[in-house]
Amino acid sequence: MRIGVVGDPDVVVGFRLAGLTDVYEVKSPEQAAKAIEELNNNSEIGLIITTERIGEQIRDSISGVKKIVVEVPDKNGPIVRENDPVKVLVRNAVGVDIK
């Protein structure tokens, strides 16, 4: 299993330095959606990493992906969400609200 990365220049440089080769540097949502599609169609790729900002821009494209997609913060830091999906899942499963 290989890992694919889709991100802006600042994000992908770190993954290239770590030795990953399936790295797509994108500058628009259209490029990102195309890169995600290419990685999704590659049978050797099992995990796709992208940034939260790109994930928000191409949410519809990501929702159809059959691989594991992980969204990481970019150089500007994490996106603060009103309803964090992980917090909602924990609250529903455990009955405790995480602050």
Swiss-Prot record:
Record keywords, A-Z: ATP synthesis, Cell membrane, Hydrogen ion transport, Ion transport, Membrane, Transport
In this record, what's one Pfam family? ATP-synt_F
* Any one GO molecular function term: ATP binding
Entry membrane topology: Peripheral membrane protein
Using the UniProt record, give the first listed, main subcellular location: membrane
Is Acetylation given among the entry's keywords?
no
Compartment(s): Cell membrane
Q: Which GO terms describe its cellular component?
A: plasma membrane
> Out of the domains of life, which is the source?
Archaea
- Record has ATP-binding as a keyword: no
Q: Which Gene3D superfamilies has this protein been placed in? A: ATPase, V1 complex, subunit F (3.40.50.10580)
| GO BP: any one term | proton motive force-driven plasma membrane ATP synthesis
The family note in this entry says: Belongs to the V-ATPase F subunit family.
Tell me the HAMAP family matching this sequence.
ATP_synth_F_arch
Tell me, in a sentence or two, what this protein's role is. Answer: Component of the A-type ATP synthase that produces ATP from ADP in the presence of a proton gradient across the membrane.
Assembly, in brief, is: Has multiple subunits with at least A(3), B(3), C, D, E, F, H, I and proteolipid K(x).
Protein name, as recorded: A-type ATP synthase subunit F
Which species does the entry assign this protein to? Methanococcus maripaludis (strain C6 / ATCC BAA-1332)
